[in-house]
Amino acid sequence: MKKRLTIIQMDVHVNDVEYNYTRVQELLSQSLSECPDIIVLPETWNTGFYPSKELINIADRNGERTKSLLSTFAKEHNVNIVGGSVAVAKNDVVFNTSYAYNREGTLVGEYSKMHGFSPAKEDQYFAGGTHTTHFELDGIPCSTVICYDIRFPELVR
């Protein structure tokens, strides 16, 4: 079963949340010209890494803005989206979280990065997630890991 993936890279503007959300919307729209089955976004595209502002103040509160954007886009354009990851604030803690949506705009996967890269002090910015996620996109079994998590293959075994 062949699937067309569009993987989006972007110049994330650290601390400029409004710019980043606007830019992601533009890039999502542009990617439709490739007729993708699945669109994948980059890590921490909403805030960038190591923002100088206090991360808790600019992170997406409970992921609401990101979830609304991705769900609406997926449904309106009949495309699966793996939302890279965004900084999400929950109860005064920030997680590096990925959301996956099917073509109907339904949230089918949510995963928060479990292993921060401590030499880069990620663990000082983000709390670790506690569970893996497994979901299907167009009948294909999928799971999400984020960056350094790939060093822990037991997450997807």
Residue ranges and their predicted role:
Residues 62, 89-157:
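Active-site catalytic loop in hydrolytic enzyme cores
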Residues 17, 26-104:
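Cys-nucleophile CN-hydrolase/nitrilase-fold catalytic domain and related Cys-dependent amidase chemistry
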Residues 1-7:
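Extreme N-terminal starter segment of soluble prokaryotic enzymes
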Residues 19-30, 150-157:
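Short, acidic/polar
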Residues 9-14:
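Short polar catalytic/cofactor-binding loops
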